[in-house]
């Protein structure tokens, strides 16, 4: 059992191309932190890669909310980080600790998409601005929260999609988030594979539908 103030919870499903790199970055930049990988039924060898490099490996049914809730149950850190497998912090444990306020209950980092095209810088900037204004973080901004508060709220709930919005809305009632100036770098693969315009339209449509009350189970079919 690792004695640490920070625990990273990483849900995975067929992330063999990313999980090894992400865990290596965490080991280098957050050497005193705990890494928990929760696999939702991968068939590409993700589990074998993760087992070698993480502190705790768990298996559950597929679904980010389900996976992250399970990982949080096993976490020992006072602060939980929820990190996507294709996203890495572009800063060190010491840099984060220096910025983290003792009074902070939750927060998130600035997003930087990995692509070199100007459009990815624009998209990153818009996502960051939206999150700063609404206090609603996207999952790839590495949401962090005090474990005691996360537990008291009941975690991510039992959602098949939009779990990041759900948690943010619960947390912002309690406290404003600390928006870090530190960046996390997230893969632009979805944007590259599906096209920028199509991806933007899909994501904004899904978010708008969720805010209007459409069930996450229904929205999942279009994701």
What residues fall within each predicted segment?
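Hydrophobic helical membrane-anchoring modules
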Residues: 1, 169-223
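Acidic helix N-cap motif at the loop->helix transition within catalytic regions
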Residues: 17-21, 44-52
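Cell-envelope/extracellular polymer assembly enzymes that use nucleotide-activated donors
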Residues: 5-7, 34, 166
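Conserved donor nucleotide-binding strand/loop of the catalytic core
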Residues: 47-74
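Conserved donor NDP-sugar-binding/catalytic core segment of glycosyltransferases
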Residues: 91-119
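Short, well-formed alpha-helical segments that are part of the catalytic scaffolds
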Residues: 14-28
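A conserved acidic beta->alpha catalytic loop
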Residues: 39-47, 87-88
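Short aromatic/hydrophobic "clamp" motif used to bind/position activated sugar donors
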Residues: 80
């Amino acid at each position: 059992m690792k004695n640490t103030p920070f625990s990273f919870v990483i849900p995975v499903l067929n992330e063999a191309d990313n999980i090894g790199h992400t865990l290596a970055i965490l080991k280098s930049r957050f050497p005193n932190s705990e890494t928990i990988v929760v696999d939702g039924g991968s068939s590409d060898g993700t589990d074998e890669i993760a087992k070698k490099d993480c502190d705790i490996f768990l298996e559950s049914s597929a679904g980010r909310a389900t996976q992250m809730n399970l990982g949080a149950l096993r976490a020992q850190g006072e602060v939980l980080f929820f990190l996507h497998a294709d996203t890495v912090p572009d800063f060190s444990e010491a840099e984060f600790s220096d910025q983290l306020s003792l009074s902070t209950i939750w927060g998130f980092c600035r997003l930087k998409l990995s692509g070199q095209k100007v459009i990815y810088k624009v998209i990153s900037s818009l996502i960051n601005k939206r999150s700063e204004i609404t206090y609603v973080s996207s999952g790839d901004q590495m949401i962090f929260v005090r474990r005691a508060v996360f537990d008291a709220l009941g975690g991510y709930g039992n959602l098949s999609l939009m779990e990041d919005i759900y948690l943010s809305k619960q947390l912002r009632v309690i406290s404003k988030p600390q928006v870090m100036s530190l960046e996390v770098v997230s893969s632009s693969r979805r944007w590259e594979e599906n096209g920028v315009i199509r991806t933007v339209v899909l994501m904004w449509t899904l978010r708008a539908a969720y805010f209007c009350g459409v069930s996450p189970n229904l929205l999942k079919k279009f994701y």
